[in-house]
């Protein structure tokens, strides 16, 4: 069913300098973006948080288990991941690629994937866009949030 597709995990420790908060590894990101231009198959990118989201999730003691986390921390983690996604997407645009940033909260409900949205991402990749999503803090239910990694 999902043949002829490259799902690439761009680790946070590659995209960022994990020992320095909010420090993107621009050289690595741009090198990867240039390398992606040589692929001739549909691509989906998933990137980690590194010194962006991971840094803040540790600071606010957030985990993959749903819990009532500090909502200020939820905002900070989420916005830091959007910032890193923007850096990666912009690098890909400069390399001549066609990335499309997607927040993982648009793909889940109650910590479960929305199958139709996952299929939509595959269809986007088939149409020459490159979906770029990431690990993030997502709403689960009530006042509970969870790290989706």
What is each stretch, according to the model?
Residues 23-30, 114-119, 146-149:
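Charged helix-capping and loop-helix junction motifs
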Residues 7-11, 46-47, 102-103, 132-134:
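Short beta-strand segments
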Residues 1-44:
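N-terminal glycine-/serine-/threonine-rich phosphate-binding loop
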Residues 18-20, 55-59, 112, 142-145:
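Short acidic, glycine/serine/threonine-rich loops at helix termini
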Residues 12-13, 50, 75, 105, ...:
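Flexible, active-site-adjacent loop/turn segments at secondary-structure boundaries
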Residues 33, 37, 44-51, 55, ...:
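N-terminal low-complexity or amphipathic/hydrophobic leaders
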Residues 59-138:
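Ligand-binding beta-strand-loop-alpha-helix segment within the catalytic cores
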Residues 14-16, 50-54, 107-109, 138-140:
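Short, active-site-adjacent cap segments at secondary-structure transitions
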């Amino acid at each position: 069913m999902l043949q002829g597709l490259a799902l690439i995990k761009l680790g946070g420790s590659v995209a960022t300098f994990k020992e320095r908060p909010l420090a993107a590894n621009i050289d690595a990101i741009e090198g990867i973006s240039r390398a992606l231009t040589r692929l001739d198959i549909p691509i989906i990118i998933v990137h980690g948080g590194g010194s962006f989201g991971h840094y803040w999730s540790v600071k606010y003691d957030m985990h993959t288990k749903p819990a009532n986390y500090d909502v200020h921390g939820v905002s900070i983690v989420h916005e830091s991941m959007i910032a890193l996604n923007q850096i990666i997407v912009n690098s890909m645009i400069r390399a001549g690629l066609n990335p499309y940033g997607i927040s993982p909260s648009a793909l889940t409900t109650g910590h479960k994937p929305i199958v139709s949205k996952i299929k939509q991402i595959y269809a986007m990749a088939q149409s020459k866009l490159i979906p770029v999503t990431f690990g993030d803090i997502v709403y689960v239910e009530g006042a509970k949030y969870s790290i989706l990694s």
